[in-house]
Amino acid sequence: MADKLGSSETLAERLQQQYRYDPVRAYRKLKNYRRRRRIRRYGVAAGILLVLGLGWGWFHQNSTDDSLLLTQTIQPGSKKAVLTLADGSVWHIGDSAMLISTAQNHIRIDSSGMLLQAGKEEKPESTDTYHLLSIPRGGEFTMTLADGTRVWLNSESELHFPLQFGGKQRKVQLTGEAYFEVAKDAAHPFVVEVCDSKIQVLGTGFNVRSYSEEGQIVTTLVEGTVCFESIEDRVILKPGEQSILDKEGRLQKRAVEVYPFVAWKEGRFIFRKQRLEDIMVMVSRWYNVEVYFEDDESKEITFSGGMMRNDGFEALMKMIETVGSINCTIKDNTVFIAKRK
């Protein structure tokens, strides 16, 4: 078995070089190769990108091992959000088209997300009036602000925003994770307030991750330039750089591979030598499940690979079982993980 896995790794590494930014194409190539070689013992599970030690490979074990116990079907997340306007009215929104009208503005929702449209009234809404878009566990949503800035919001995230921007800055407030594609306006910097810190840009694409339970603010820059400013320090980021502010107030900057940090907005999970405990934090938000580790050793197992976020939860857990030599039991929306003995 080790020899067969090794040969698959070698092929996967070659494909990764050839199709570095197209894992789906690489998977199809690997699938055709395996069919020609007629390796019967292993099947390919579409959507699972797996690294075994040194290289990437699309792999799924077609085993008779039934250690994964499912008592219910776990569905992936979907487009859904709760919009709370400043007047206290609450709207539950999703893919269905709808139009919400305020005294001065319109909020249009369709399959592409939420779009803010300014009205033509003589007395526009005060720019000090902020509304709230909340994304629950198992949800995601996209919105376009009044200035044309697009925002992708991940599960368990909140964005405070005005229906219209005014003054010298375009300011929003974020909790959780979001990707911003900021409309260019040199005269009016775009500012994202996160806890006691702020990120200032003119026109750029960047990701911000700030969940209270994680104890850090991670800003990853895709294009343009941003300035991250904490209470005590500040850094300027260039494309391919990331700032991390920890709970002790320490601010650091480093160069990173950007894609794993922004792949979620394109419907993918991408992992690069990540601890299983950290992976399950992301997975639990998207699939809206609880996770319980029965031993500390399982938390430290590292994985590299990826899959589509809309793939089945069972496929993901079987992949983790196979690679990590662990047992997973799912009961009452809770995943129990233990090191295989």
Annotated model-derived regions:
Residues 11-42:
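Positively biased amphipathic helices and basic secretion/translocation or surface-docking motifs
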Residues 50:
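Conserved beta/loop motifs at nucleotide-recognition and modification sites
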Residues 9, 19, 53-56:
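Prokaryotic Sec-type signal peptides and long signal-anchor helices
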Residues 1-10:
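N-terminal amphipathic alpha-helical interaction or autoinhibitory segments
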